[in-house]
Amino acid sequence: ADPFALLTVDETALVATPLHGVASHLFELSLGSNSRGTVGTGVGQSYRDALKYPELALRVGDLLAPDLRDRLYAVRDCIANYVWPVLLDAEFLREDSADVRYELELLRDDGFVEYIARRFREAGKLAHIVPHDYLAETILRKEGVAVIESSHGVLTDNVHGFTPHTSAIRTLPKQSRQLLDDAGYTGQVVNLGVTRAYAVRHGAGPFPTGDTTRGRHLHPGSESQDNRYQGQVRAGALDGVLLRYAINVCGGPTAFDGLAVTWFDQIKRDGEWLLCDRYGGELDPAAFTPQGELRVRQEPTEAQQALLTAAL
């Protein structure tokens, strides 16, 4: 069977290019030992660039455009212009020197741009590219169930996550719900929160229940997933404090119809299910309530959100 025959892609979807991935890698390397963490595929960087340089943004509908090659060169030149000043002021780790040289060579290599153009054209021919109204006019008119999944975890939200270890986008369920509202959908909606039966974090950032002795058992093969950009895969006990915080920033328990807890098969193999319900020690009253729960920031107004977006 042809898997691409089952795949439809909105023609207005933003395209993250490998050039944005190079920018993401270089920015992460420029932080030295102060890792922020990045998937490194350029998704967040392409979103930021689409806001700052909308005339250069590539959409899925552009993959077969006659001027695709020229537009990729324009994207490359733009990235080179904003990356270079950052690199001049950066204090790279000595052990990152080879990686920095490699990424810069890619950015200078016209052959790399030509390769991207070829592969993008191939992808454009394989993918079933559909109009933006396909969700409303086709998918939501079918019998059955449509599953809408957010692309990021709640705690990577750029307002309620833990700066600077956040995504460039908003990741709350209401962003996914907006897709349905924009499509004019008025039928039944079931909201499910989803979490693993244990905590896992890929890369830098706070991880109160992280346990280096349990990562290999809870997440087999995770040690082979390490890279310089995302960092180490860490695992630990399911964190009730962070789970309740994530639920609360989404609107509280009443915002959900249920909570799906996954990966119990791994817990069974590990032989022990560890849960954290409260943090010990003295907690910062500015961040925690007297009951030991994380305080939820107020949602930004439209004007405040515009400022946050402009600062990305």
Named regions from a protein language model:
Residues 1-312:
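Non-transmembrane, aqueous-exposed alpha-helical and coiled segments at domain scale
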